[in-house]
Every structure is written in C-alpha cells, then in structure tokens.
C-alpha cells in the first residue's frame, strides 16, 4: 500500500521521530512493590533515521527493521545505532510494516489482536483460542510448525514475510531461518514484563504509538489492583497430579514459577515456604528450576509416589506439607476441560470431600481453564500474556471474594463450568478465508517535513 511505504526518500528526514518511538520501561516502574521486580529485560529497541534495531537477548538475534521504500542500510550504519552485543549474536533484516506473517504458537496472538493485526496473520497456531484465530484455522490457516509436515511448512513460510516463534528453554538458540523472529514474552520473568512485549511486536508493524498507549493502560490498571499481603493473608499453592507415563513417574507437583508467585503476592496472597516443605518431606521432595539453569524462572517441586508404599500414603504426606494452604489452583492436564470436576480433583489427589484441609472445607479449588476454545484449548496460554491485569483481578476474587467475574480461574469446588469461545464472534476480514485481498493500511509514523527537491531522491 502506497500509504505504508515511502514514495520519496530523504536522508535528511527522521522517519521514526522520538515522539512515536518506544522505550522499554525500567523494571522499577513495573510494580509498586519494588522488592519483587526483576531487573532483566529480554529485548531492547534502538532507532536510526529510516530503520530500527531490536536486540533479542534470549535468542541472541538482532532484527533490523527498515522502513519500506527506504534504501538498504549498511552494516556500518546499523553498528552506529546498535552494535552486535557479542560474536554469538546474528542479524536478520525485514521491511516494515510486515504484510503477512505466521505464528508458531498461541503466545503471540493476543498481542496481534490488541494491535488490530488479525488481517495480517496468514497462518496461526492450531491451538489458538481467539474467535478470529479459530476462524482462520477453519480456512486452512493453521500453521504446520516445526513438528508438522515439512513440505507444507516450507510452502507456508515462503508465502509470508516473517514467522514469529518462541522457545521453552534457555538458552534459546538463534534460528538459521532468515524469516524466523523469536518472541520471548513467555520467558520474561514478570507479569508486566511479559505485557510490555507488545512494544516488540508493534515495532514490526510501525504501531509503536498504539503499543505505548496500550501498555500505559495495562500498567495503570495492573498497579491499581495490587494489594499488599497482610500477615494473615490467604496462602496459595499451584499444584498438579502427574500420572505415570513413558516420560514421567506418577507424582504430585507444586509450581513456584516466578510469574505465578509474583501474581499471588500482588493479589494480596502468600506463597508457600519451600524450605518448610523440604523440612516436611525431606529428600523425597525434588526441587529444580522451572527453566533449567535460569533461577529467575522460579522452582518446581516434585514428590514421586514411588517413594511411598502407596499413592494414598504419598498424598497424606504431600498435603500434610500443604495443611495451611487456603486456596489451590489445580493445573492437572485434562484433554476435555469441561469434564474435569471437583470429583476428578479428589480422585487425582486421593482426597475426600470430608477433608478438613482449608481449601476443601471452604470450597477454594480452582483451575486455569475458565475460558477455552471449541477445541478445548485454554485461553490461559494465549490472552493471559498480554493481559496480566485480568489474571490479577481473577486471583483477587479467588483469594478475597471481591464479587467480580473471572476469565481464567474456574472454581470446580463450586461446580463452575468453562466459558467456550467460538469463531462465530469474529467479524474481521481474514486473508486465510479470502475475505479480503489486502490488509487494512498502517499509516507511517512520521509527518514529512518540507525538504527541498535537491535533497530528495526516489528510491529504486
């Protein structure tokens, strides 16, 4: 679209003026409780006059984003703006705004939705939840990904400008595919850090001004919800039962992932004391980093039932260590979330409804499947990343009974059912469905100054 690209280029113009640039907020600004804010960010953005450079620290990649219609930039010009941090870092170049993209997972989708970019997503994750993503999948818009059919994936990759991917472990090695972009939102350690990745996404589409506005509101809404925990605040545990499988022994688990413990603290709750659990369960309790080698990711605690004479005995020991927990969030996998009930919970954890445990006696047993797709995929793994304020609101209601509605948390002890999202509510015209041949135009970020014709030259 002519309105998205330069028709005449001037080396005297600044096509990305400071008024529309993004800057990654200092970590100390991302929470009122400064003691729990992490100081590490996973990306940074620097601007030249006609290009911008995103440095993605986890993948050790730089993405050079050149305004369409501007001439190519040299390595020396890029180095003057953002030199490579190390010899391990590599560079990839894209023309922005991107026209058509693919997304490997659900992680990126809520960011794209908030920026109004659904009409630029040609292929999306087959596990997507949002109405328009489900509509796209039904029109053969499902992305094959690394584990799909290689021939189909190659065809899909060839038809798009970029493929947004993520990884689940560190270090996340750079990809040799020149179109792949690593989106590290799910690896950033804090709820607001994660939400700030909307600025990363926006830079590929010249939507920085919109991203600044969205994130400012998210930051304000989240901080307005923060509640410092009192001494007698409810104690919360994120638990899971893992059945025997070819890759896992039967076990009871507790997640102390960094983002989860921060959410609980911000909601005015108390987290488990890992040392106390270790004292109670001894060497039978295995404690490890959620992401191996990354302490900031938090800890996962595993108690194998094989260390006891029976599952029942293991359950007794496990819940003796959780005897003062007021609220549990059960993350046990269920292929059909709507069929997972309070009875399922009791069976999995070898408990009875007559138990004196506070979370059973007071009906405080929640799951994270409060909103799902028609194909049983959880919105928790999609929109939560972009909307930490929604999660915090859910948790405050679960802990303190604020009377608000909840999007992600479902109280199975109170027989609540999941809300199911379908494609019928999507009204966006999508490329995968041949609703439209072009995407909605994205205006350039600058207003051209008056430049003499002698200083201007058309771009070849």
What is each model feature region?
Residues 1-458:
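N-terminal ligand-binding lobe of clamshell/alpha-beta domains
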């Amino acid at each position: 679209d002519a309105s998205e690209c330069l028709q005449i280029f001037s080396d005297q113009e600044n096509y990305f003026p400071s008024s529309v640039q993004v800057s990654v907020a200092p970590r100390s600004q991302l929470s009122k409780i400064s003691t729990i804010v992490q100081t590490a960010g996973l990306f940074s953005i620097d601007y030249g006059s006609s290009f911008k450079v995103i440095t993605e620290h986890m993948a050790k990649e730089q993405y050079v984003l050149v305004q369409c219609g501007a001439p190519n930039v040299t390595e020396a010009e890029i180095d003057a703006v953002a030199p490579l941090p190390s010899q391990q870092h590599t560079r990839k170049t894209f023309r922005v705004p991107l026209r058509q993209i693919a997304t490997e997972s659900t992680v990126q989708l809520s960011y794209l939705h908030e920026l109004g970019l659904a009409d630029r997503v040609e292929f999306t994750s087959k596990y997507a939840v949002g109405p328009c993503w489900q509509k796209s999948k039904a029109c053969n818009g499902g992305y094959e990904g690394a584990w799909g059919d290689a021939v189909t994936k190659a065809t899909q990759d060839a038809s798009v400008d970029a493929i947004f991917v993520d990884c689940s472990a560190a270090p996340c090695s750079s990809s040799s595919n020149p179109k792949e972009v690593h989106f590290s939102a799910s690896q950033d350690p804090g709820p607001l850090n994660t939400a700030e990745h909307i600025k990363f996404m926006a830079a590929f589409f010249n939507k920085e001004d919109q991203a600044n506005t969205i994130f400012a509101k998210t930051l304000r809404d989240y901080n307005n919800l923060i509640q410092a925990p009192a001494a007698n605040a409810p104690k919360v545990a994120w638990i899971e039962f893992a059945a025997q499988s070819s890759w896992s022994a039967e076990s009871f688990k507790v997640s102390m992932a960094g983002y989860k413990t921060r959410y609980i603290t911000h909601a005015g709750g108390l987290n488990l004391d890992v040392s106390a659990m270790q004292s109670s369960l001894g060497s039978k309790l295995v404690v490890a980093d959620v992401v191996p080698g990354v302490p900031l990711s938090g800890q996962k605690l595993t108690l194998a039932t094989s260390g006891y004479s029976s599952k029942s005995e293991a359950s007794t020991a496990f819940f003796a260590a959780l005897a003062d927990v007021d609220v549990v969030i059960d993350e046990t996998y269920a292929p059909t979330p709507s069929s997972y009930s309070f009875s399922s919970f009791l069976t999995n954890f070898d408990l009875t409804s007559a138990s004196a445990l506070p979370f059973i006696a007071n009906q405080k047993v929640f799951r994270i499947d409060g909103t799902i797709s028609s194909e049983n995929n959880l919105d928790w793994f999609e929109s939560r990343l972009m909307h930490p304020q929604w999660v915090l609101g859910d948790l405050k209601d679960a802990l303190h009974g604020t009377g608000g509605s909840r999007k992600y948390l479902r109280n199975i002890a109170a027989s609540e059912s999941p809300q199911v999202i379908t494609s019928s509510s999507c009204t966006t015209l999508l490329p995968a469905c041949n609703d439209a041949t072009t995407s909605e135009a994205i205006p350039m970020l600058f207003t051209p100054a008056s430049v003499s014709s002698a200083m201007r030259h058309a771009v070849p």
